[in-house]
Swiss-Prot record:
Membrane topology: Multi-pass membrane protein
Gene that this sequence comes from: uppP
Protein name: Undecaprenyl-diphosphatase
EC number from the UniProt entry: 3.6.1.27
Function: Catalyzes the dephosphorylation of undecaprenyl diphosphate (UPP). Confers resistance to bacitracin.
GO annotation terms (biological process): cell wall organization; peptidoglycan biosynthetic process; regulation of cell shape; response to antibiotic
UniProt subcellular location: Cell inner membrane
Residues that span the membrane, as ranges: 6-26, 45-65, 90-110, 116-136, 190-210, 222-242, 252-272
Length: 273
């Protein structure tokens, strides 16, 4: 593979990762399809995907740095809570409660989960995840009990964490599982999405570091330019995707995302079967 060709592949996959990582459409499904079409598969490809995920995580940190510092009691500039707003406050405890279920299951069944990374499982996960998005839109309370992040209860945070366990099924979509769970628990669509992004930082960071540690032997100095291009591309595109997504969900439901998931599932079937 020539240098220019590998850098082009890195840029394309970085765009795919950045666009899909935090949308409820399954980045795994997209990466499997695009990687296959580009002929970029195998151990190096898996390690590359782990590295560019760090770029997406960095985008969330940049977007929500004020809120993330606030979770540990460090506030910059204006306070997060204004007069007339909820007397509640999103805390680190909410994040920990949201992390525990999937973190425990992920650590215990890490190798088993990795064995599920194949097109047929991803295809089924895309469909089931789409059905969950539709169910969340149809069954959510008419008036959310938690309109904003600071209105969320510990119970809601923990239940969202339980829904996040569904994302251990490759192709399900972590954001799709957590946002759907939040809406079913009475959290507004926007607040559930914000919480999903905040929850992504420790969850994805932990999983990515673990994967990177186990994949370290597949890294070589010759891969650094390719990995760097993928990382930077994923970071920039993820920033744009997150901002656009948060504006978009103020105006539309998640039904279009569910339909899109069904289309991607069909694409997986066509490409691999």
């Amino acid at each position: 593979m020539s240098d220019m060709h590998s850098l082009l592949i890195a840029a394309i996959l970085g765009v795919v990762e950045g666009l899909t990582e935090f949308l409820p459409v399954s980045s795994t499904g997209h990466m499997i399809i695009v990687g296959h079409l580009l002929g970029f598969e195998g151990d190096t490809a898996k390690t590359f995907e782990v590295v560019i995920q760090l770029g997406s995580i960095l985008a969330v940190v940049v977007m929500f740095w004020r809120r993330l510092f606030g979770l540990i009691g460090i506030h910059f500039g204006r306070p997060l809570q204004r007069e007339g707003e909820s007397k509640g406050q999103l805390t680190l405890i909410h994040i920990l409660l949201g992390m525990i279920p999937a973190m425990v299951l992920g650590l215990v069944f890490h190798d088993t989960i990795k064995s599920l990374f194949n097109p047929i499982n991803v295809m089924y996960a895309l469909v089931v995840g789409g059905l969950l998005l539709i169910a969340a839109e149809c069954l959510k309370p008419k008036e959310p009990r938690a309109p904003g992040l600071d209105d969320m209860t510990y119970r809601q945070a923990f239940m969202i964490g339980c829904f996040q366990c569904l994302a251990l099924w490759p192709g399900f979509s972590r954001s799709g599982a957590t946002i759907s769970g939040g809406m079913l628990m009475g959290v507004s669509r926007y607040a559930a999405s914000e919480f999903s992004f905040l929850l992504a930082v420790p969850m994805m960071m932990g999983a990515t570091v673990l994967d990177l540690y186990k994949s370290w032997s597949f890294l070589s100095a010759a891969d650094i330019p390719m990995f760097a291009v993928g990382f930077v591309t994923a970071f920039v595109v993820a920033l744009i995707a997150i901002k656009t997504f948060l504006q978009l969900i103020k105006r539309i439901s998640f039904i279009p995302f569910a339909i899109y998931r069904f289309v991607v599932a069909a694409a997986v079937y066509v490409v691999f079967f």
